[in-house]
Amino acid sequence: MLIVTTEKVEGKKISKVLGLVRGSTIRAKHVGKDIGASFKNLVGGELTGYNEMLTEARQIAIGRMVEDAEAKGANAVIAFRLSSASVMQGAAEMLAYGTAVVLEDDNSILEK
């Protein structure tokens, strides 16, 4: 599945627009790790526990968006975006969304 942030793909034409697709997940940090992160926040440095949580959340949200796109018959997602929001202390939602499309080779480029 091709996923791009642009609205067009060089050498391809959009033969069908299938609409909005999205995937999301909400993740919370383990209380013990949260205490460690609070201490790290005082002394400085990367909060690796949160970084890992957000990386996993992105992967899950994108995977769910791809499942949504495939269910609609898409072979690509254009105008892809990621958004995150805090839903409560220690928990965040990750949302992946874009436009599901069917792309085909643009043979008109070869004719020029």
From Swiss-Prot:
It comes from Clostridioides difficile (strain 630) (Peptoclostridium difficile). SUPFAM superfamilies: YbjQ-like (SSF117782). The lineage of its organism: Bacteria, Bacillati, Bacillota, Clostridia, Peptostreptococcales. InterPro entries: UPF0145_dom_sf (IPR035439), UPF0145_YbjQ-like (IPR002765). Belongs to the UPF0145 family. PANTHER family: UPF0145 PROTEIN SCO3412, UPF0145 PROTEIN YBJQ. This is UPF0145 protein CD630_17110.
